Amino acid sequence: EIKKSLNTLKIDKLPEIICEPGRALVAESGSTIVRVNLRKKQKLYINDGTYGTLFDGGVPNIVYPSRLITNGRMISKKMTAFDFYGPTCDSMDYMKGPFILPNNIKENDYIELGQLGAYGLTFRTQFNGFYSDKIFEVEDEPVMTMYDKDKSKSYLVA
């Protein structure tokens, strides 16, 4: 597919293309559950961050699809854009988002962040003592999929 697209370009000589399509192939393979430790207006302080499984959310600013885990409680229909801050107190432990979540999210709520891909677990560090080696395997539908058969759905992409 990449070669076919390159051949449609109107240039005399194609450059050598080197790519690693890993994210496109396995983005949907992983998600993580984070806990909200503190909320200050549109800032959520969570128990994971860029030194944990969410590196790509900070440095290249990938906006992970997110959903509140409701545990049966009523959630607001009003959605709000949030920034995330990780637990390390380091200025790099920040994820700009926007992460669109219900307006009534509060401390001790849980959020699923999807599309971690192959590198979520690989990039984890033990910086400032925050590290967990607990991994649980569950099966569920992805938070968001690029393979959705219903093309009438639209997603906010930042």
Predicted regions and their residues:
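Acidic, glycine-rich loop-and-beta core segments that form the ion-binding/anion-interacting portion
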Residues: 1-17
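Charged (often Lys/Glu-rich) extended helix/loop segments that serve as interaction or gating elements
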Residues: 16-158
